[in-house]
């Protein structure tokens, strides 16, 4: 990694060594360098222990790096996102040696989608078999013994805790439950040299990776000029496990009549249905608009 770049990868921000900041921030760095609680001895500091942070911390530790992970809340999250992992995501876990994170969390195989325009108009789309990939899609997937290209759906929180468990099992990973409030910059060349927490603890490492999710507090400062535009919100509820029409499939339910009634340039999003375990099925409804309506 060069020292003059910022890299955004699926919500993770990697900060390196040539950030130009105001003198006030440089003065803060000088103060931090003399802080009584300074901590060092790490190769990488990782802010956030979600899917990206936990998986990356485990991989870096297995490669011999000394990793410090700072996460504001290590309890099991209760969220309605990140519940259906596509086949490519399953293969990525295999590449990282983390496919066993899908074991023991009551995950449901996902073999494709059933898309509905009306109760009588629907089409089933199956994920391809491995042998079909070269001829149909121009590539192959050599990973794993299973010849079926399948995803998994699950409770998001259970998957997060499984990834965290594997991360914490690495002897060279240290986990601190703390909120990171700022990045620390060197006074001389203003590179990022660590982080400061809400309790004023300061930790140092040559590389700092911020993976604190879609609502990252550091995105405005380090993410460039791009600002995500919110077009809609998902509203979710849990249904009984037998609510799915086609087992082991995600369901996309379109509303043709509603789509005809909306104003030009706007559209009504779909409803998504998929089983997330032997105990529940998830229903997500896309609500258009930048602000979620009050209930």
PLM features per residue range, with description:
Residues 3, 21, 25-27, 31, ...:
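Intrinsically disordered, low-complexity repeat/linker tracts enriched for polar/charged residues
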Residues 74-94:
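Conserved N-terminal glycine-rich FAD pyrophosphate-binding loop of Rossmann-like flavoproteins
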């Amino acid at each position: 990694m060069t020292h003059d770049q910022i890299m955004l990868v699926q919500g993770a921000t990697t900060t390196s060594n040539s950030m130009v900041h105001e003198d006030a921030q440089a003065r803060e760095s000088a103060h931090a360098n003399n802080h009584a609680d300074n901590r060092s001895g790490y190769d990488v500091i990782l802010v956030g222990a979600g899917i990206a942070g936990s998986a990356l911390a485990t991989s870096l530790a297995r490669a011999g790096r000394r990793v410090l992970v700072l996460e504001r809340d290590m309890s099991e999250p209760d969220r309605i996102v990140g519940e259906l992992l596509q086949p490519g995501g399953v293969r990525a876990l295999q590449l990282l040696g983390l496919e066993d994170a899908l074991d023991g969390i009551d995950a449901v195989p996902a073999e494709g989608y059933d898309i509905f325009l009306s109760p009588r108009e629907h089409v089933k789309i199956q994920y391809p078999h491995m042998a079909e990939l070269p001829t149909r899609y121009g590539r192959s997937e050599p990973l794993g013994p299973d010849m079926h290209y399948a995803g998994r759906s699950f409770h998001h929180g259970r998957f997060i805790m499984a990834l965290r468990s594997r991360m914490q099992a690495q002897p060279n990973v240290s986990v601190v439950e703390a909120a990171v409030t700022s990045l620390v910059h060197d006074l001389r060349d203003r590179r990022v040299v660590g982080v400061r927490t809400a309790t004023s603890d300061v930790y140092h490492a040559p590389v700092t990776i911020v993976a604190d999710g879609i609502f990252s507090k550091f995105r405005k400062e380090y993410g460039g000029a791009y600002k995500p535009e919110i077009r809609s919100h998902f509203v979710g509820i849990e249904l009984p496990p037998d609510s799915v029409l086609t087992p082991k499939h995600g369901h996309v339910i379109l509303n043709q009549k509603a789509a005809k009634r909306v104003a030009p340039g706007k559209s009504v999003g779909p409803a998504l249905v998929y089983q997330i375990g032997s105990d529940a099925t998830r229903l997500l409804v896309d609500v258009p608009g930048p602000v979620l309506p009050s209930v």
